[in-house]
């Protein structure tokens, strides 16, 4: 779809959506997004120019269907997949991609750390994906030197970053906000540093006693990104890994640096979103969202969860979806899903489905709460189908039609029950929506209440007996 769109841009020094928007040009990607979001094209251009909206769309990801992340658009959901040294199979990762797209993931991150050829699995995923793909390049940087922090140099990081751009990665998590002076602030935490990328860079800084190379070479990374229209996802290396560590000095010190880096990237006309926690008590979620907006000049916020309790292994997709819904309500632009396997192991395809559905619920709840245009239309349509006992339409409008039908059919599998005016919960005689009270009955009752008062009502026969 995008071949003709990007053909004229190749070879230019800056091909980012922000660059065109700031010149007053509405790109085909912006027009496409405007239609998807039901927004004016001019508003999309203005929001991208301002930095409040991003359209992650690498010029080398030709089969991409452009989408927007920002407070003016619907709340988005990211799904994570990726092979590890202990569990690796490219076909399994492609199956996870298919499931993620099927169940409505808006973006997807390939977090592969080993066990497969990382370039090969990334290329396969990008070629198969209609949604934006994100990566964490420091993983491959470490893998390229066989896990040796001592052999890892600044150029290794930049080489891998550009390779990911060349392959068509739409956004990259760049952990540039973690500074060497932040590391002592981690003392006193229960879980310390829980970001894998942050952990790699912390080890690198402590070994070499040098500043974070992603910070010192940040302008070089901007120069790379603008040639491909790759978007920054500024990583939160010091995100809290438990409730105890939430909103502490270390987290907020890094957030301040992330705000400074956001504005530096914007000077290059490079798109930015900012990553956030993590594990956060419910009463601190609003503070975290507001603080990010303040420090990062309203760049789109992209949060992992947050989990609102630490005692839910096996059910962390539920704990975190609670926090995610709240974060989305307060203005977070994209929610990174958590699966039931969080903290326990590598997710399988079924875990991907469970996590994604939980987060689609959270994102949709946020859209409804923020009164986004058309957000409740599907809810109202399903409610009408429920009132009319149109079971097939209820299944169709569900976030997970297959599961809705499966649960209904466990007790009433015969096709005749798809037209029944009851389910197995209430049976045919006790369903309150099955009572034959008509609008005419209610109008007649209201007339009597208005004329006589409730205490003096005369019994009337319903127009239709129950």
UniProtKB/Swiss-Prot annotation:
Keywords: 4Fe-4S, Iron, Iron-sulfur, Lyase, Metal-binding, S-adenosyl-L-methionine, Thiamine biosynthesis, Zinc. It comes from the Bacteria. Catalyzes the synthesis of the hydroxymethylpyrimidine phosphate (HMP-P) moiety of thiamine from aminoimidazole ribotide (AIR) in a radical S-adenosyl-L-methionine (SAM)-dependent reaction. Zn(2+) binds at residues 279, 343. Gene3D superfamilies: 6.10.250.620, Radical SAM ThiC family, central domain (3.20.20.540). Its EC number is 4.1.99.17. Signal peptide: none annotated. It comes from Prochlorococcus marinus (strain NATL1A). Substrate binds at residues 80, 109, 139, 175, 195-197, 236-239, 275, 302. [4Fe-4S] cluster binds at residues 423, 426, 431. GO terms for biological process: thiamine biosynthetic process; thiamine diphosphate biosynthetic process. Belongs to the ThiC family. One of its GO terms (cellular component) is cytosol. One of its GO terms (molecular function) is carbon-carbon lyase activity. InterPro entries: ThiC, ThiC/Bza_core_dom, ThiC/BzaA/B. It is an enzyme of class 4 (lyase). Pfam families: ThiC_Rad_SAM (PF01964). It catalyses: 5-amino-1-(5-phospho-beta-D-ribosyl)imidazole + S-adenosyl-L-methionine = 4-amino-2-methyl-5-(phosphooxymethyl)pyrimidine + CO + 5'-deoxyadenosine + formate + L-methionine + 3 H(+). Pathway: Cofactor biosynthesis; thiamine diphosphate biosynthesis. Binds 1 [4Fe-4S] cluster per subunit. The cluster is coordinated with 3 cysteines and an exchangeable S-adenosyl-L-methionine. This is Phosphomethylpyrimidine synthase. Its cofactor is [4Fe-4S] cluster.
């Amino acid at each position: 779809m995008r071949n003709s769109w990007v053909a004229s841009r190749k070879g230019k020094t800056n091909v980012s959506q922000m660059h065109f928007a700031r010149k007053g040009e509405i790109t085909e990607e912006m027009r496409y997004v405007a239609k998807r979001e039901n927004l004016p094209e001019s508003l999309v251009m203005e929001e991208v120019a301002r930095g409040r909206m991003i359209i992650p769309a690498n010029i080398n990801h030709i089969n991409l269907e452009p989408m927007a992340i920002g407070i003016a658009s619907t709340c988005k959901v990211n799904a994570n997949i990726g092979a590890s040294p202990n569990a690796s199979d490219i076909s399994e990762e492609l199956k996870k991609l298919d499931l993620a797209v099927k169940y409505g993931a808006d973006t997807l991150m390939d977090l592969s750390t080993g066990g497969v050829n990382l370039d090969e699995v990334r290329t396969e995923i990008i070629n198969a994906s209609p949604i934006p793909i994100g990566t964490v390049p420091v993983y491959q940087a470490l893998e390229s030197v066989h896990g040796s922090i001592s052999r890892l140099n600044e150029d290794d990081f930049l080489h891998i970053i550009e390779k990911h751009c060349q392959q068509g990665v739409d956004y990259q998590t760049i952990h540039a906000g973690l500074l060497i002076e932040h590391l002592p602030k981690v003392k006193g935490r229960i879980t310390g540093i829980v970001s894998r990328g942050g952990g790699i860079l912390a080890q690198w800084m402590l070994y070499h006693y040098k500043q974070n190379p992603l910070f010192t070479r940040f302008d070089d990374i901007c120069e790379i990104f603008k040639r491909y229209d790759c978007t920054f996802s500024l990583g939160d290396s010091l995100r809290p890994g438990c409730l105890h560590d939430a909103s502490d000095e270390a987290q907020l010190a890094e957030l301040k640096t992330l705000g400074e880096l956001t504005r530096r990237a914007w000077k290059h006309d490079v798109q930015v979103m900012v990553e956030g926690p993590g594990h956060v008590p419910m009463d601190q979620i609003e503070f975290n969202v507001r603080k990010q907006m303040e420090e990062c000049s309203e760049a789109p916020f992209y949060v992992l969860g947050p989990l609102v309790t630490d005692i839910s292994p096996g059910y962390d997709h539920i704990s975190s979806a609670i926090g995610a819904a709240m974060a989305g309500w307060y203005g977070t632009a994209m929610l990174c899903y958590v699966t039931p396997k969080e903290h326990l192991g590598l997710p399988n395809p079924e875990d991907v489905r469970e996590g994604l559905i939980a987060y689609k619920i959270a994102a949709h709840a946020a859209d409804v709460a923020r009164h986004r245009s058309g957000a409740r239309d599907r809810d109202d349509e399903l409610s009408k189908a429920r009132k009319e006992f149109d079971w097939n339409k209820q299944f169709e409008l569900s976030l997970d039609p297959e599961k809705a039908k499966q649960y209904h059919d466990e007790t009433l599998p015969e096709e005749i029950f798809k037209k029944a005016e009851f389910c197995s919960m209430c049976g045919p005689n006790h369903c309150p929506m099955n009572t034959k009270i008509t609008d005419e009955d209610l109008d007649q009752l209201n007339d009597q209440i208005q004329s006589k008062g409730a205490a003096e009502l005369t019994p009337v026969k319903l127009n239709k007996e129950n």
